[in-house]
Amino acid sequence: YGAAAFARSVSADILTDLLDVYPAKDACTVMAIATLRIIRPSITAERMGTHYRRTFVCQHYPGAALSANTICTFLQKLGQDGNRRKAFYQKRAAAVIASHHIAIDGTLKQDSSTVNDLSAFSYKARRKGCQEVSVLYAYDIEVMEPICAEVFPGNSIDASSYAAFIRDNDIRRGIIVSDKGFPPSQSK
């Protein structure tokens, strides 16, 4: 009970923002999946439904269908609905207190999927022999809370990906955390 109750208590504002953008069933499904992944970080999609029914997560977020196939379909639909995702991100960004700092950072994640058109060989990945995607995200430094995230092709230049990320998510202030893939001329 404790872990699920704690997760619910610190994420109530996220549920409120989700309910403003998504249908109630979808918002509860997002929160159920997120809560289960927090409580059990290594949980697989096949076990998620079982743990959902065995924990208080089903009491907090009722009506979530969490079979492995349903989760996959739901997450694909969620990821493809760019307008709602953008509306949710804008609500989260608007909630950031003016005195707080926003960090914009990115990382490369291995992804050798044959069906993902974002998977590509980055500069470093060519030596390793695996494809990657570039995940960019913005978060509030003071409260250590994510604001938004977006996936880019693994072979894209950091400067162009960051510019598109900032433009797409209408980020007006922030600190860019960059590395050697970001030319000094682009860091204005």
What name fits each language-model region?
Residues 92-96, 127, 168, 188:
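A general structural signal for short secondary-structure junctions and capping/turn motifs
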Residues 69, 124-126, 155, 185:
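Surface-exposed loop/turn and secondary-structure junction residues enriched for glycine/proline
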Residues 1-113, 136-155, 163:
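Dynamic "connector" segments at or just before major functional cores
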